[in-house]
């Protein structure tokens, strides 16, 4: 469980591909300070398990399913990545539960600086936008962001200078691919609501429905 | 409160059945290192209270309700079990919010190795799947897992080699029974949504309802 | 933050009432071992601030609001109370997240011993049950408990012998009043869902809604 507050940006030291899976070695200082085997660390928003570590670097295994559903394939030696350790038990209940299970990717289609904020338009599938809500939360490469604009195929988020300087947002350009996790609560509500609708709409609003209700 | 990151596997030393309840004596080293009477330890995902301990073993009481709702009845002397101590205040939520209150059991119906991941199909009741969501979390024998496939009667989780080697997943086969805890967040939202649906549908659609909405 | 694992039962030495507020002096040994002015101690699940202490006793002030919302008024000299210190940095969440902010009281309406567990039916307001969920957590007089039964106006919890012997559950009878705190995660999600419902229901049922449904 994470909160979407990036702790530091690390650097890819090595990428070992074996068939469809991958092992990443990442240089970092803060998240390795108390690391142990089996710990969970979010790498660009993807929850990965630490399988090895030394002073200032750690290694993680990436399953085929995860490689396929994220932007990890676009990484190379020297790439910068957002890093966050799992939420600490005495941490604050942030406004946003992030599981680190990425739902898909999006493409940056517009970057616009307005006063002290930068607006990013992200093109993404309706499968993802359907569970989102205006002013709701979305995680972009592990960064918890607020949704300022929303349509069937795009989302607009606005990022403050501090977040840009502390994350890989600073390395992004129009055309960049980012990992997207939709807010957990929205996903649950969408599924429950549509399962109920499904059961209800199997009983479509028919003439009989009205007569049952005395019309 | 747990997080679904198993700390070690212990071994059943003795099982004492009294009527419908049970007392288990479990050999372990890591979770007994700082154990105290009254501590909570998750045994195959079930939160149990320590009622006795010595150097490398501890004893727990199991209520009839818990014996009935879980796979504990299938254990025997020498069985391996997953163990996790309650979240430490300075610990991290490497998995998700796990209460240790098991919701039911599931049967493993398929095990498939794909590259560096192993996929498990679990057959379980619609009463449990109704509160789950794709890419959501589920606890299997105390192991925090990601839902990669979901239907009314089954869930597919994928487990990385590290987790398999560190837990009793390594002892499981098709037909094995596992304990399931559904994600707490999903259960809450499901109940709230259906209570709201219930209150809404109790207000049958009346003449007044239509006029209020301008028809 | 507490976790609902009672450390010891203390004894009321003195109760000083001033208008609607109250000062309690409580005899205890364990929780006074490292006590300091300003520390938080949960008394029957109520987070109170230590305003004075000597070897084996401490004093706390109780605000009118807290006196009104809890069962403290029912205490007298010699009454036993459940005590728990705030989570220490190296403590463990053996129960669940407990804030010590009591939501209300409940009346015990049934006590039934079944094998090695005792079941308690608690009558409480729908305002409290609405945020609860089956197999979820609830705090009863500061004791973290699992919800085994739930209806609009009642909750059933089951308590193991160890917990009964270590807490004031042993002094309770049918008719006793207990303090209730509902699970923090449930309250948080309930509020979040109803805020979202409010935003949705502002979009009244329009002509379009009906034409979409074929009318």
From Swiss-Prot, chains A, B, C:
Pathway membership, UniProt: Cofactor biosynthesis; riboflavin biosynthesis; riboflavin from 2-hydroxy-3-oxobutyl phosphate and 5-amino-6-(D-ribitylamino)uracil: step 2/2
Keyword match Transcription: no
Gene Ontology MF terms in the entry: riboflavin synthase activity
The protein's enzyme class: transferase
Keywords: Repeat, Riboflavin biosynthesis, Transferase
E.C. number: 2.5.1.9
PROSITE patterns, A to Z: LUMAZINE_BIND (PS51177)
Reactions mediated catalytically: 2 6,7-dimethyl-8-(1-D-ribityl)lumazine + H(+) = 5-amino-6-(D-ribitylamino)uracil + riboflavin
GO terms (BP aspect): riboflavin biosynthetic process
Gene3D superfamilies named in the record: 2.40.30.20
Keyword Cytoplasm included in the entry's annotation: no
Residues where 2,4-dihydroxypteridine 1 binds: 4-6, 144-146, 158-163
Residues annotated for 2,4-dihydroxypteridine 2 binding in this entry: 47-49, 61-66, 100-102, 135
Residue pairs linked by disulfide bridges in the UniProt entry: none
Lumazine-binding repeats: 1-96, 97-193
Alphabetized NCBIfam families for the sequence: PRK09289.1 (NF006767), PRK13020.1 (NF009566), ribE (TIGR00187)
Quaternary state and interactors: Homotrimer.
Function noted in UniProt: Catalyzes the dismutation of two molecules of 6,7-dimethyl-8-ribityllumazine, resulting in the formation of riboflavin and 5-amino-6-(D-ribitylamino)uracil.
UniProt name for this protein: Riboflavin synthase
Organism lineage string: Bacteria, Bacillati, Bacillota, Bacilli, Bacillales
Gene (name only): ribE
């Amino acid at each position: 469980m994470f909160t979407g507050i990036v702790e530091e940006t690390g650097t890819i030291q090595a990428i070992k591909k074996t068939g469809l899976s991958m092992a990443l070695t990442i240089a970092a200082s803060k998240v390795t300070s108390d690391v142990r085997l089996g710990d969970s660390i979010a790498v660009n928003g993807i929850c990965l398990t630490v399988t090895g570590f030394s002073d200032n670097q750690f290694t993680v295994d990436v399953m085929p399913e995860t490689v396929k559903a994220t932007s990890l394939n676009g990484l190379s030696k020297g790439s910068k990545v957002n890093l966050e350790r799992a939420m600490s038990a005495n941490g604050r209940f942030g406004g946003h539960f992030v599981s680190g299970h990425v739902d898909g990717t999006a493409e940056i289609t517009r970057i616009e600086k307005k006063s002290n904020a930068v607006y990013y338009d992200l093109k993404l599938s309706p499968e993802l936008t359907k569970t989102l809500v205006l002013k709701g939360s979305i995680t972009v490469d592990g960064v918890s962001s607020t949704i300022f604009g929303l349509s069937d195929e795009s989302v607009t988020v606005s990022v403050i200078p501090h977040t840009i300087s502390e994350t890989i947002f600073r390395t992004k350009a129009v055309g960049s691919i980012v990992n997207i996790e939709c807010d957990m609560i929205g996903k649950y509500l969408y599924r429950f609501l549509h399962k109920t609708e499904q059961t209800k709409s199997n009983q479509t609003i028919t003439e009989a429905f009205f007569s049952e209700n005395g019309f």
